[in-house]
Amino acid sequence: MLGKMILLPLFVLLCHSLASASLAYRGADISSLLIEEKAGIKYKDVNGQAQPLENILKANGVNSVRQRVWVNPSDGSYNLDYNVKLAKRVKAAGMSVYLDLHFSDTWADPSHQTTPRGWSTNDIGTLTWQVYNYTKEVCDTFASNGIDVSIVAIGNEIRNGLLWPLGKPNNYANIANILHSAAFGVKDSTLSPKPKIMIHLDNGWDWSAQKFFYDSVLSSGAKLVKSDFDLIGVSYYPFYNPSATLSALTTSLKNLRSTYGKDVLVVETDWPVSCPNPAYAFPSDLKDIPFSVAGQKTFVQRVANVVAQTPGGIGLYYWEPAWVQNAALGSSCADNLMVDWRTDQARTSLSVFGTI
C-alpha cells in the first residue's frame, strides 16, 4: 500500500510534466527588442516589476526565441551584429536561438522578396554561391561567438519564391538550387551541433498551396532533395482569411508530415485583444474565442493542441508579442500583443507558454 501511495504522486507529477511540456519548442519572435529598448521601452512582468524581456519570457515558459536576420539593412536593424547581440541575451536567459534568414535587406514575405544590394539578379550560379557564402558566414559568426543555434530557416514565407527575380515561382529549379545552397551553407558551417534546417511558408492552413510548393521544388530536377532540410514551418494567422480554420490547419500539418516526413511547427501566429474592425471574417471554428487577454490564451492553447496532436508536431512561436510600438502587427486588428503597449507590462496571456 505504501508503495502505491508513493507511486501515485509520482505518476500524477509525471503526467503534469508531460501535459505542460508537450511541445519541444515553445517560442516567441522578439526581433524588435533592441529597437524597442533603444526607444526607451522598459518592460515589466505581470507584477509591474521592470525586467529584461527575455527573463520575463523565460519565467512564463518560453524556451526558444526566433530572430529575423536581414543582410544589409540601411540602418543596421536586424543585421548580423544586431542578431548576435540579441542572441547572447537569449542564450544567457537559457533559451534556444532560431534564426529566420530573410535573404533580403528588408522584409521578405509573399509580396516582397527583394534581392540584397550587391547580389546577382541575372545569374543563378553567382546568386547561389552568394547565398551559400552568406549563410555560412552567418552560422560561422554565431559559432565564433559561442552561440548554439537550434534552427535556421532558409527564407521567410517563401510560397512565392525568394530572391526575386531569379527565385520567382516561374522557375522552381532556381528556387530549389537557392534552397540547396542555403542548406549547405548551414551544413558546412562551424556550428556544432548543427542546427535543424527549416523551409517556411505562409498560409499554413492551405494544404494545396503547401503541397504545390514542395512538389514543385522537389520535382524540379534541380539540386534540392528531402535530406537538405529537417523541418517544415508555417505561418498561421486567423485574421487574413476566413478559410484559415483550425480544422484546415490540422489537415495541412498532418499531410505535410505524412507526405514529406518532416517535423512541423507553427512559427508565426497571433491573436488580438482588440479587433473592432477586422478586414476579413474570422474562421468559423475560432469565432467562439473572444478578442481579449483570456482569448489569447485559449487561441494559443488550441493551436498548440493541433500541433501536439500532429505526428512530428514539435513547436509553436508567437510573432512579436512585445512590439509595443506596433500593436497591430501589420493586421487590421488594433492590438495583438501579449505586452500592454500603454504600460509595457506583460499580460497574463504570456503564461500560456507554460501550459503548452
UniProtKB/Swiss-Prot annotation:
Presence of the UniProt keyword Signal in the record: yes
Entry EC number(s): 3.2.1.89
InterPro entries (UniProt xref): Glyco_hydro_53, Glycoside_hydrolase_SF
Function: Endogalactanase involved in the degradation of plant cell wall polysaccharides, and more particularly of hairy regions of pectin.
Family recorded in the similarity comment: Belongs to the glycosyl hydrolase 53 family.
A GO MF label: glucosidase activity
SUPFAM superfamilies: (Trans)glycosidases (SSF51445)
Alphabetical UniProt keywords: Carbohydrate metabolism, Cell wall biogenesis/degradation, Glycoprotein, Glycosidase, Hydrolase, Polysaccharide degradation, Secreted, Signal
Glycosylation sites per record: N133
Cell compartments where the protein resides: Secreted
Name of the molecule in the record: Probable arabinogalactan endo-beta-1,4-galactanase A
Signal peptide: 1-21
Residue positions of the active site: E157 (proton donor), E268 (nucleophile)
Gene Ontology BP, a term: cell wall organization
